[in-house]
A protein has these predicted regions:
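Conserved beta-strand elements of the Class I
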Residues: 26-28
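Short acidic active-site motifs
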Residues: 13, 76-77, 99
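Short, acidic/small-residue loops that bind anionic groups at enzyme active sites
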Residues: 1-21, 103-122
Length: 130
């Protein structure tokens, strides 16, 4: 289907937001198998030269509710991406949202939750009359 209304993808909005926070960004994926899909989007967007890396935490969406395991792995991934040169990190799954602030505090770099980024961009478009 086609529409004349704007369509904002959460991954794209998350990456665009991350690019305003520094030169290079990283992505935290849920599974290794998610990375190829993310890379296709990053390449299509033309921003692969600014990707510091992507790390998978090895948990399917259903297991993200295990707070201890998820938070530990996400913090480890964010710190590794920071050490790889990322100035900010994008969460690769909307199911990670509840961990954003704690991961950001532990890693010491901005962490972008892509659904929040998309909502803010959509609100901006509305306010600008687009």
């Amino acid at each position: 289907e086609t529409t004349r209304k704007p369509v904002l993808g959460i991954m794209e909005c998350g990456i665009f937001t991350a690019l305003t926070l520094g030169q290079r960004f990283g992505v935290i994926a849920i599974l290794q198998s998610s990375i190829a899909r993310h890379l296709r989007t990053i390449i299509t967007m033309g921003v692969q030269s600014r990707l510091a890396g992507e790390r998978a935490i090895g948990l399917p969406v259903i297991e993200l509710s295990d707070e201890s395991k998820t938070l530990t792995r996400m913090i480890g991934a964010a710190k590794a991406l920071r050490d790889d040169g990322a100035d900010s990190v994008v969460m690769g799954c909307a199911g990670m949202a509840q961990y954003r602030k704690r991961v950001e505090q532990a890693a010491g770099i901005p962490v972008v939750e892509p659904t929040q980024a998309a909502v803010v961009m959509a609100l901006g478009r509305v306010r600008l009359g687009w």
